[in-house]
Amino acid sequence: MAAVAAEARVFLEVRRRLQSALLILGDSKEGGLPMAVSVTPSSLRMQSPGGCTELRLPAGVRLAPSTCRGLQHVPGDGLHLRLHARAESRPELISVFNQSSQDQECCTFYCQSCGEVIIRDRMLLRVLPLPGDNWGALVDEWCCHPDPFANKPLHPRENDCFTGDCFYLVNLKSDLWQPRPEGAPVETHHLSSENHLKLKPKANTKVICKRCKVMLGETVSSETTKFYMTEIIILPSERNFPIIPRSQFVQSVLAQCVVELSSARSTFRFTIQGHDDKVYILLWLLNSDSLVIESLGQYTNIKKFPVLEDVLKPDSNSACNAVKVLYQPCIKSRNAELSSLWENDLSVHSLTLPSTTCLELLLILSKSNATLPPSLRCMNSFQVAFLKM
């Protein structure tokens, strides 16, 4: 995708399932100027006295110019119009553990922030998902015998890795070097198979990267450690550590997580809480089939944050698969009443991440919201954002 000039701001959201697109053309100058707009199946061209902007669409994306409808000018945004569009299917989400390619391979666990090796050359013979929240209810409903695993923890063996919603459970008994917790040995008590174990809050169980001091996870027993998916990269040992911008990695992990949960459990609302049990964000998945294409032009009202160095900069173009979410921040007692309602709602799923990652995610969502055209930033009482896949 290339731009001849970057005078106009262009925003295009293509919905694959609906085969429709919302196109917003805005001029960077207050008050607007006369503009000639040309839409072809593979490009957009905006000609104004101030210059010309041409946006070529990615391969696989096609517009239907004859279907343009709903043309209107929205103050602060520019021209809005809708039209039919087609986009190639989004690549299927691939789990970190692709059983066909990584089975029986040695894997290395890295700290995503700095690349420090956490576990080297671990042969994972079994990668198993932990039972879902409704596992106990299903056993009681459908089985003629009591649940044999009730009130028992599920701990991985030496060459096992158990996967939760947003964490891994790994047995570190045989590792010569283990990431050590900050405090005393952990004590656990067991509730049910839905919550395979709970940590007593009085014990400090954080596992810290010895190089960058980032929290990677928590110890759950003398042999088992929980690593958060947002902090760890797992690769076949023969592959080199990839440098992935932090915000890009956090977005992709969380986006994949909520899409998989919504598909498996018909869950669309999530509370994002820290390891300190505080709720930081209320997240509502709106759709997961968006392709977002934008050229920011001279959009200069974007503050820069070090953690977001890879997010769109002025005079840049971007095309990405994304999930569209609604969110509400809950820090500093904001939205406390709504947060309490969600926490007590059985249809809302809770995701736990390190508290610093929750704050990073909130910053990412706020940044995404700030780059949207003003008319798209709010829906009802929620703020709107896109998480890149």
UniProtKB/Swiss-Prot annotation:
Molecular function, one GO term: cyclin binding
UniProt xrefs under InterPro entries: UBQ-conj_enz_E2-bd_prot
Reaction catalysis annotation: S-ubiquitinyl-[E2 ubiquitin-conjugating enzyme]-L-cysteine + [acceptor protein]-L-lysine = [E2 ubiquitin-conjugating enzyme]-L-cysteine + N(6)-ubiquitinyl-[acceptor protein]-L-lysine
Motif (BRAT1-like motif): 129-159
Pfam families named in the record: HECT_2
Segments for region (HECT-like): 353-389
Record region (Interaction with UBE2C): 235-257
Residues reported to bind Zn(2+): 144
Modified residues (N-acetylalanine): 2
UniProt pathway annotation: Protein modification; protein ubiquitination
BP terms from Gene Ontology: proteasome-mediated ubiquitin-dependent protein catabolic process; protein autoubiquitination; protein monoubiquitination; protein polyubiquitination
Enzyme nomenclature, EC number: 2.3.2.26
Disulphide bridges: none
Subcellular location field: Cytoplasm
UniProt subunit comment: Interacts with UBE2C/UbcH10 (E2 ubiquitin-conjugating enzyme). In vitro, interacts with cyclin-B.
Function: E3 ubiquitin-protein ligase which accepts ubiquitin from specific E2 ubiquitin-conjugating enzymes, and transfers it to substrates, generally promoting their degradation by the proteasome. Independently of its E3 ubiquitin-protein ligase activity, acts as an inhibitor of CPSF3 endonuclease activity by blocking CPSF3 active site.
This protein's domain notes: The C-terminal half (AA 188-389) is able to bind cyclin-B and shows a self-ubiquitination activity (mono-, poly, or multi-ubiquitination) in a HECT-like sequence dependent manner.
Name assigned to this protein: E3 ubiquitin-protein ligase E3D
Organism field: Bos taurus (Bovine)
Gene name, Swiss-Prot/TrEMBL: UBE3D
